[in-house]
C-alpha cells in the first residue's frame, strides 16, 4: 500500500470538508482510516507503529468533527418545516370599524394576485387587513404548492439520513470491537478481559538467548499463517496447540511474552486462578467464555502457564469433581464437536500455547491436543555467553572480565540462574563502597561513587554464592519424556 495514496486521500478529504462537500469528505476519511488500519499490520517497528496510531487518532478526530457538522446541518433542515396557517385569518374585531366583507369564492387571475402581493409587501401597515382577507380563499392552493416543494426536500433528507447511517457504520467498523457477552455474567467477561495483554510486554526475539528451534516453531505457528494465509490450509493448517516443556528458568514465559510482542495477535495470559471459581459450574463457563472471546478477537493466542495445575491426569484419587469438569470443558473447546474447528481462514485462528515444568503429570487427552511439543533445554555454552552479554549490556565492566570464561564455569546453570549471578555480581561494588558507612553517609554519596565497574573477582564471588537450581536427574527425566512424547 502506497503512503502517497494515503497522503492524497487525506488531502482530498480535507479539501472537500473545507468546501462544504461533507458527504464526499466522509467517504475519503473512511477510506483513509481503512488504509491506515491495513498499513499498521505491516509496520514492525514499535516506535513507528505508535506514531501511526497517533496519526490515525488525529484523522479519526477530524472525521468525527465532519460527522458532527453533518448532524448539525441535518438538525437545521428538520427545524425549517413551514408553519401551518389557518384558512381564514381575520383580525380582531373593533367596534368602531366595520367588518370586512366576506370574500367571494372565485379563482383570481395570476396578474392581480401578483400585484396584490406586491402591494402587501410595500404597504404592510396600511393594507394588513385587506391582504389577510384577500389571501383567505387562496390558502388551499398555496398549501398544495408547499406540498409539492417539500417532496424533493424530504427525498433529500432521506438521502442524507442514509449517507449519515452509512458513515456512522463505517466509523464503527474502524473503532475497537467489543465482545457481546449476552448470556454470561458481566463479572466473568471483565475478569477475562483483564487477562488480555493490550500493553506491549516489550520482549523481542533478540532479547532471548539461544532457543532458535523454539523461536522458529513459534514463528511458524503464529506469524507465518498471518503472512501466508493461502498456504496454511488443509493438511498444512497452523498448529492449534503448542506445549513448551523444560526445567524451571529456561525462558518458556519469556518466549510467550515475545509472541505477544512480535506477533501482533490478541494475547490471553491465563493462569489457574483465572479459570477457578467457588461457585458450582462457573469454572466451566469461564473456559467456554474464554474460547468464545478468543474466536471473537481472532487471531488469538491463549497462553496457559503451568498447565499441569489445571489439566493434571484424570482418574486419580486426589482429583475433585469440579476439576474434572473443567478439564472436560477445556478438552472439548480445544478439539471437540463444538470446539475449535479447522477454520478455513488461518488469519482467524486460535492457538493454545502452554508451558509446564511437569509434563509427566499432564492428562493424555490434553497431550494429544497440544500437537507440537518442544523441549526448552538448559542454555548451551554459546547460549550462556549470549545471555551474559544481554544481562550485562547496561553495566560497566572492568578490563579483566572474560565473558567466555564465565560462561564455561556456568555449565548446568539455567537462564534464571545466570541472571541471578549477573545481578549479584553487579551489586558487589556497591557493597564494598558502603561497607562501614553510616546511613547518613550512604545518603550523601554521589552518583559517580556508586557506579563502579564490575570486576572478574565479583563474578567469581557471585558464582560461589549462587548455585544451579536444576539437578542432573531432573534433566534425565525431561529428556526421557521428550524422547517418548516429543
From Swiss-Prot:
Enzymatic reactions: n ATP + n H2O + a microtubule = n ADP + n phosphate + (n+1) alpha/beta tubulin heterodimers
Entry's Gene Ontology BP terms: cell division; microtubule severing
Record bears the keyword Ribonucleoprotein: no
InterPro entries for the chain: AAA+_ATPase (IPR003593), AAA_lid_3 (IPR041569), ATPase_AAA_core (IPR003959), ATPase_AAA_CS (IPR003960), KATNA1 (IPR028596), KATNA1_MIT (IPR048611), KTNA1_AAA_dom (IPR048612), MT-severing_AAA_ATPase (IPR050304)
Region (Disordered): 84-145
GO cellular component: centrosome; cytoplasm; microtubule; microtubule cytoskeleton; midbody; mitotic spindle pole; spindle; spindle pole
Function field: Catalytic subunit of a complex which severs microtubules in an ATP-dependent manner. Microtubule severing may promote rapid reorganization of cellular microtubule arrays and the release of microtubules from the centrosome following nucleation. In mitotic spindles this could allow depolymerization of the microtubule end proximal to the centrosome, and subsequent poleward microtubule flux.
HAMAP family: Katanin_p60_A1
PANTHER family: AAA DOMAIN-CONTAINING, KATANIN P60 ATPASE-CONTAINING SUBUNIT A1
Family: Belongs to the AAA ATPase family. Katanin p60 subunit A1 subfamily.
Protein name: Katanin p60 ATPase-containing subunit A1
Organism: Xenopus laevis (African clawed frog)
Amino acid at each position: 500500500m502506497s503512503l502517497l495514496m494515503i497522503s492524497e486521500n487525506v488531502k482530498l478529504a480535507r479539501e472537500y470538508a473545507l468546501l462544504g462537500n461533507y458527504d464526499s469528505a466522509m467517504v475519503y476519511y473512511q477510506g483513509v482510516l481503512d488504509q491506515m488500519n491495513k498499513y499498521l499490520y505491516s509496520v514492525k517497528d514499535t516506535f513507528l507503529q505508535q506514531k501511526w496510531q497517533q496519526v490515525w487518532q488525529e484523522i479519526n478526530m477530524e472525521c468525527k468533527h465532519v460527522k458532527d457538522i453533518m448532524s448539525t446541518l441535518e438538525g437545521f433542515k428538520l427545524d425549517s418545516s413551514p408553519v401551518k396557517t389557518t384558512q381564514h385569518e381575520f383580525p380582531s374585531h373593533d367596534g368602531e370599524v366595520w367588518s370586512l366583507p366576506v370574500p367571494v369564492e372565485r379563482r383570481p387571475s395570476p396578474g392581480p394576485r401578483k400585484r396584490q402581493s406586491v402591494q402587501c409587501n410595500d404597504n404592510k401597515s396600511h393594507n394588513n387587513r385587506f391582504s389577510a382577507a384577500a389571501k383567505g380563499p387562496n390558502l388551499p392552493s398555496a398549501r398544495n404548492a408547499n406540498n409539492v416543494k417539500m417532496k424533493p426536500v424530504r427525498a433529500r433528507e432521506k438521502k442524507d439520513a442514509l449517507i449519515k447511517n452509512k458513515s456512522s457504520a463505517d466509523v464503527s467498523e474502524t473503532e475497537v470491537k467489543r465482545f457481546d457477552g449476552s448470556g454470561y455474567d458481566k463479572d466473568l467477561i471483565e475478569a477475562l478481559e483483564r487477562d488480555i495483554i493490550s500493553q506491549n510486554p516489550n520482549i523481542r526475539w533478540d532479547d532471548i538467548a539461544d532457543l532458535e528451534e523454539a523461536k522458529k516453531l513459534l514463528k511458524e505457528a503464529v506469524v507465518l499463517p498471518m503472512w501466508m494465509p493461502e498456504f496454511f490450509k488443509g493438511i498444512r493448517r497452523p498448529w492449534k496447540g503448542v506445549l513448551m516443556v523444560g526445567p524451571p528458568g529456561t525462558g518458556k514465559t519469556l518466549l510467550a511474552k515475545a509472541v505477544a510482542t512480535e506477533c501482533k495477535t490478541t494475547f490471553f495470559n491465563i493462569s489457574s486462578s483465572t479459570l477457578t471459581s467457588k461457585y458450582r459450574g462457573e469454572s466451566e463457563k469461564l473456559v467456554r467464555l474464554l474460547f468464545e472471546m478468543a474466536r471473537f478477537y481472532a487471531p488469538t493466542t491463549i497462553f496457559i502457564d503451568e498447565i499441569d495445575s489445571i489439566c493434571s491426569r484424570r482418574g486419580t484419587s486426589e482429583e475433585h469433581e469440579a476439576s474434572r469438569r473443567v478439564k472436560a470443558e477445556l478438552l472439548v473447546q480445544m478439539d471437540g464437536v463444538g470446539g475449535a474447528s479447522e477454520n478455513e481462514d488461518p488469519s482467524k485462528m486460535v492457538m493454545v500455547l502452554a508451558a509446564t515444568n511437569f509434563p509427566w503429570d499432564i492428562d493424555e487427552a490434553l497431550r494429544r491436543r497440544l500437537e507440537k511439543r518442544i523441549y526448552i533445554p538448559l542454555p548451551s555454552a554459546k547460549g550462556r555467553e549470549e545471555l551474559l552479554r544481554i544481562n550485562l549490556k547496561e553495566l560497566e565492566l572492568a578490563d579483566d572480565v572474560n565473558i567466555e570464561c564465565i560462561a564455561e564455569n556456568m555449565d548446568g546453570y539455567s537462564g534464571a540462574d545466570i541472571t541471578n549471578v549477573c545481578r549479584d555480581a553487579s551489586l558487589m561494588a556497591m557493597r564494598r563502597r558502603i561497607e562501614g558507612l553510616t546511613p547518613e553517609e550512604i545518603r550523601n554519596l554521589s552518583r559517580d561513587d556508586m557506579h563502579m565497574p564490575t570486576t572478574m573477582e565479583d563474578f567469581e564471588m557471585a558464582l560461589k554464592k549462587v548455585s544451579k537450581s536444576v539437578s542432573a536427574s531432573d534433566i534425565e527425566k525431561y529428556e526421557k519424556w521428550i524422547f517418548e512424547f516429543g
